[in-house]
Amino acid sequence: RRSARLDGAGSVDVIQKRLVDYSRTLSAGSWVVGRGWMPTDFPGRTADRRYLDVVFPDRPVVIRDRDGHQALANTPALELAGITRDSLDPPDGWIERGPDGEPTGLLKEAAASLVTGLLPALTIDETYQLLREELGTAASFGLTSLQDATDVGLTRSESAAVMRAVEMGTMTVRYRAP
């Protein structure tokens, strides 16, 4: 998925700036997605939706952390997902709540999919283009093989994009998926 790169941000200010800059490339009202943040980017290592709400009070935002085990969603994204203080934690995940019982926006493990599952699906062409970009990134680091560490495998669009890359000779790494 195309997203704002948050790797190495180091602070909330940098995360906010990168998200705002990225949002300018999107159509009005579309989701703002980012990835790569670290807990240490937030004061007291406490990620909270309010840091996103300040710059996006009316537009849904979700950012995945660097290791993929949690996501931070702003208030509009939580509202679209129907996440409230009364929401039950999903199996294999949990919704972080503040002392007042309200969701903080931090969604751990499977709870992240409550919001990320609302993102529009990518077409095969979009997925293939993203794959090509990521293969270029992998090559820049000298990587020659990659493994999907998830237990769910690839989506249909992702599988089709990988097959297209293999058929067109643009798959520059060995790839293993469950």
Which positions does each model-derived feature cover?
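Divalent metal-binding segments
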Residues: R1-P178
